Amino acid sequence: MIDKLKLVDHVQAINWNRIEDEKDVEVWNRLVNNFWLPEKVPLSNDIQSWNTLTPEEQQLTMRVFTGLTLLDTLQGTVGAVSLIPDAITPHEEAVYTNIAFMESVHAKSYSSIFSTLCSTKEIDEAFRWSVENENLQKKAAIVMDYYTGDDPLKRKVASTLLESFLFYSGFYLPMYWSSRAKLTNTADMIRLIIRDEAVHGYYIGYKFQKGLEKETEERRQEIKDYTFNLLFELYDNEVQYTQDLYDTVGLTEDVKKFLHYNANKALMNLGYEPMFPKTVTDVNPAILSALSPNADENHDFFSGSGSSYVIGKAVVTEDADWDF
């Protein structure tokens, strides 16, 4: 006989007028102000540009986006959700639910790109590839192990590394195309995603550091060793994944520099020193320029608006206005 679910004696409503950590409100407001949906980005304007890519470049782009979809799916349905039980404040819980929702929006946004630019057969082949690619599946499995484990700090480390590091082998390509005036509307949407992930990685890293403050020196060292070992493991796999994708177009070494750069940023979010020296983090200036808030379509990273992000405006009309 299955035991009945044990219910708590009472449920406490979240009170946004009593804040324990101001960072919760700050990040919540940032995420809400940054809210966007893929349907508002005119991706169809990229069809002509898409047709200028070679079949190999189109396949690479689809595989990159399918890999990003897998990570967003993992983060939206498992990663962010796994952080909720360990939240210190109800407002922290609310932020994690926001993060989980936006990860699902990100995952859906790639399907919007596919349905606009690709055939059903091409889409199915790309998703089949994501299941069969060993390195892609391996990085998902590595992170999943810690999401389902019983150590709250290690979950936050794994989540921060995914948000601030693992996505970036994929984010490189749309920025590369954008720097060459290709797929600029798609790149605009990817910038919106990158803006979200930057906030996610920062916030989860912040909560990790707050939790670490309560631990003993021995425990802190254990977590630091774990963090660098996990990053090494993920990096080694990511290099193989990058080679598998980018060798055919000769971009592997540039992408690796981008990985080094973002690995250091992930460690910074966790409060640790960089792992890679500056000599191997000299990212192509064109990529950094494409990442900037005023790149290409002039998106405003902080308001969620931009020339490619379209929101309808209401205009007062009279009956006579509809007589054509």
What residue spans do the PLM features occupy?
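Non-heme di-metal
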Residues: 1-324
